[in-house]
């Protein structure tokens, strides 16, 4: 599980947690820990939190509202909205937008787009704004695709939690560096990897980030 920051030009993995069934913590517990770390340790002030429907639980949404944070999420069709199942709203019309409450009395704005439902507590924005904002979450999916395909994310042989954390951390760190290089050189991560594979001198031509610190 990873929480990332993006300005839509670059996307940086900020922190992560490894979920273990026997730890006594749920995925929602870990999600709250990551949010807390970003808000109160790193003191990041995000414009909003974006996540998929699994995390759109009453407890997590209320946690974000408590800390005055905006959220955008997809939501399952079997959730109730104004005490009626989403799938039964508006006679099954494929497109609509309405403000109301979901479980726990959480006030949200719901947008239906074809067969999918989206919620936000940023009440009053347009349907287009809500859908476009949620689409930014695709940047997170791109992180996992790239680190799995290109950086060996799933090829960790360590059985220890520390070893796995080190491996995942290195993958995310390399991804962040590649994002910085890609932005400075106006190239994609994949293009950088391809050129570096074909031209051994290519790395010397790049504008690289400056790293500081003592060993």
PLM region spans:
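Short, solvent-exposed loop/turn segments at secondary-structure junctions
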Residues: 8, 55-57, 77-80, 124-125, ...
